[in-house]
Amino acid sequence: MDLEQKYQTGLHALKEYASTAGFTDVVIGLSGGIDSSLTAVMCVEAFGADHVHGFMLPGPYSTDHSLKDARDLADNLGIETQVISILEPYEGFERALHKVMGGDLEGLACENTQARCRMVCLMALSNRFNWMLVNTGNKSEAMMGFSTLYGDTAGAYAPLGGFYKTDIFALSRWCNERAEEEGAIPPIPHHVLIKPPSAELSPGAEDEKSLGVDYATLDKILIAHYDQGKTAEEVAALGFDLEQVQSIIVRADSYAYKRAMEPPFPQNPFYV
């Protein structure tokens, strides 16, 4: 599929799913990152700006530039936005767990608790106002288990769930180019397109550093093995390090249980 076809696939599936489920409005967490930005663009086209409710949920490691990127995106799209800090609930969990944890939350416990605090807030809004929570995850992260169960894996539908991270970048650029051709403001801020992706759950964190591989390489390996059925040796013959290929395959296979908890997406419509 070309970029327009990929975009339309996600768009139409999102509209159909929400309609079947009885939702007219959606809620989305706006992190200032490229995944939530592209998802927001798709939601506005699917439901109209008045029916898309965006929330920024800064935590202890959120950066000012990401909040600005999220605000700029919302302004470009004309959607309602509000800020809900997760510091208070996060610190509440930290206090409650301090004794049994033997101190403050650290490592994955610290990072994942932040993600789950965000999702508790978004789900509360979904329940209170009958808004469908739209998931912003992508296939690269799902394959590598680079997500938080009951955190950023939550949501009723994931319009980008079948697209790799490199697809997300390409689709985001395509959306901006389309807007320019139509004489409109490019919806996704330029800074979102060029900054290193980060979940901002720890100081200075960047996705590619955490994964140990850049997205361009990762996606090529995942596509060759899982989509095209090539063996690890055949993938390595394409110009990749065999040890790296094997490591990625082992990790992806080991996180199948996480993928089973991901919401439905256009390429995996188990709800039909």
Region locations from a protein language model:
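ATP/NTP-dependent adenylation/nucleotidyl-transfer catalytic domains that generate, transfer
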Residues: M1-S31, S36-V272
